[in-house]
Amino acid sequence: MKILLLILIAYLLGSIQTGLWIGKVFFHTNLREHGSGNTGTTNTFRVLGKTAGTITFLVDMLKGTLAVLLPIWLGITEVSPLIIGFFAIIGHVFPFFTGFKGGKAVATSAGVLLGFVPLYFVFLLLVFALTLYLTSMISFSSITAAVVGLITLATFPAIHFLLDGYDPIFSAVLIIIVLVIIFRHTENIARIRNHRENLVPFGLNLTKQNPKK
């Protein structure tokens, strides 16, 4: 019963669409009607500005971290914290509060890693930041970090200092997270191939922006 309650709490926590509510409450703007129509960090940055975008990213990330830490704080050892964190990701992608139309899982997934394997989170964050600096594309940077996560998982002996050891649950959850992130970025991948992906005002690739209207 405790585990089911934790899963429900994590899912509902993940279902909170931070960018959407910030837009409606403070800007009287529905993110679904502007930019890409997504309620995640990137579109929030683009439509509502840096402050709203930063808050959205931090809150969405902390949803995952909090979900992972809940069973640890409560002393519940019958279930892996990763499983609880995973349901926060599911809530973020398929939120009950907004008709099961949510974000792309990146920030909340990052939060899950932060709560469970902080050094690994820092490593992938550096990969994300470097890729973003080189390409100015958040979508490509997110996909790259996700794929690098899989590669490093497959080559564990080379990065053993980042992880305590092989964990079947961690491996399974990470693989699913990567697949979800790639699936949720299908449209972005198509725009990247056509050189039409939206850029952000950061990094080296700022002169080729051709945003989707």
Curated annotation (Swiss-Prot):
- Specify the protein's topology with respect to the membrane: Multi-pass membrane protein
Principal localisation: membrane
Q: In which pathway does it act?
A: Lipid metabolism; phospholipid metabolism
Do you know which Pfam families this protein is assigned to?
G3P_acyltransf
- One GO cellular component from the entry? plasma membrane
**GO BP annotations listed:** phospholipid biosynthetic process
Catalytic activity annotated for this protein?
Answer: an acyl phosphate + sn-glycerol 3-phosphate = a 1-acyl-sn-glycero-3-phosphate + phosphate
Q: What class of enzyme is it?
A: transferase
The GO molecular function terms of this record are: acyl-phosphate glycerol-3-phosphate acyltransferase activity
Presence of the UniProt keyword Cell membrane in the record: yes
Its subcellular locations are: Cell membrane
* Chain segments annotated as transmembrane: 3-23, 54-76, 83-100, 110-130, 142-162, 163-183
* Matching SMART domains: G3P_acyltransf (SM01207)
Question: Which family is this sequence assigned to?
Answer: Belongs to the PlsY family.
Q: Which PANTHER family match?
A: GLYCEROL-3-PHOSPHATE ACYLTRANSFERASE-RELATED, INNER MEMBRANE PROTEIN YGIH
The record's annotation in NCBIfam families points to:
glycerol-3-phosphate 1-O-acyltransferase PlsY
Q: What does this protein do?
A: Catalyzes the transfer of an acyl group from acyl-phosphate (acyl-PO(4)) to glycerol-3-phosphate (G3P) to form lysophosphatidic acid (LPA). This enzyme utilizes acyl-phosphate as fatty acyl donor, but not acyl-CoA or acyl-ACP.
**Assembly:** Probably interacts with PlsX.
Q: What is this protein called?
A: Glycerol-3-phosphate acyltransferase
Q: Which organism is it from?
A: Streptococcus thermophilus (strain ATCC BAA-491 / LMD-9)
Please name the gene that encodes this protein. plsY
